[in-house]
């Protein structure tokens, strides 16, 4: 049995070439993930093409945008330009710091505090806002709206006044006024000509209260 197993093991040959990752018979295996065999015109084309993954600590941006091949002269020129730009940035930073220091000294001598400067900035900012076309249009719109609202309120007041006059001149109101006048004439005497309706109501109320407070005649005769 062991001899037979040894013979099968010696005769067996794997269909895969594990050194190159190529199945010469029917299947292509590649550690890079590309499904096209070597030499195929579609080897670098397709949806399954994979990109190399950045290792830990490796700059992925540098991998994605690999630098172009530069000559030594070009690299040296770029280095000189880089050094020059860095020196210019440092010089500008020093100049800016000196200017800011000089500005603070001038403000101190003029007595300009941070609060005053803040107020000036607020005032200037508001002035700039009021000078814009958007603010002017908004202000005009609000002004027109206010005028329309005032006109509407005036119209409402006029309508209410007219309605009250119409009610006062209506036959129903006049009939009620005549009844009140008749009641007053019966209770407190005749109403003088030209009397006010408010006076009529007050007189009627006073006469009614007087009648309710006076004792009946029978009680007055029985009392000693």
From Swiss-Prot:
InterPro entries: TPD52. Forms a homodimer or heterodimer with other members of the family. GO terms for cellular component: cytoplasm; endoplasmic reticulum; glutamatergic synapse; perinuclear region of cytoplasm; synapse. The gene is Tpd52. The keyword Ribonucleoprotein does not apply. It comes from Mus musculus (Mouse). Pfam families: TPD52 (PF04201). This is Tumor protein D52. Residues 202-224 have a biased composition (Low complexity). The modification Phosphothreonine is found at residue 35.
